[in-house]
Amino acid sequence: FLPAIAGMAAKFLPKIFCAISKKC
């Protein structure tokens, strides 16, 4: 992956996990 894509994933994945698990 490109560093930019990895950076985006690092930002969005925690938010998605937070929304699914509802543990923010």
UniProtKB/Swiss-Prot annotation:
GO CC annotation, single: extracellular region
InterPro entries, per the entry: Antimicrobial_frog_1 (IPR012520)
Gene Ontology terms: biological process: defense response to bacterium; defense response to fungus; killing of cells of another organism
Expression sites by tissue: Expressed by the skin glands.
Keywords recorded for this protein, A-Z: Amphibian defense peptide, Antibiotic, Antimicrobial, Disulfide bond, Fungicide, Secreted
UniProt cross-references to Pfam families, sorted A to Z: Antimicrobial_1
Principal localisation: secreted
Disulfide bonds: 18-24
Record carries keyword Secreted: yes
Compartments it resides in: Secreted
Keyword Disulfide bond set for record: yes
Similarity annotation: Belongs to the frog skin active peptide (FSAP) family. Brevinin subfamily.
Function, as annotated: Antibacterial activity against Gram-positive bacterium S.aureus and Gram-negative bacterium E.coli. Has activity against C.albicans.
This protein's name: Brevinin-1Bb
Native source species: Lithobates berlandieri (Rio Grande leopard frog)
Native organism taxonomy: Eukaryota, Metazoa, Chordata, Craniata, Vertebrata
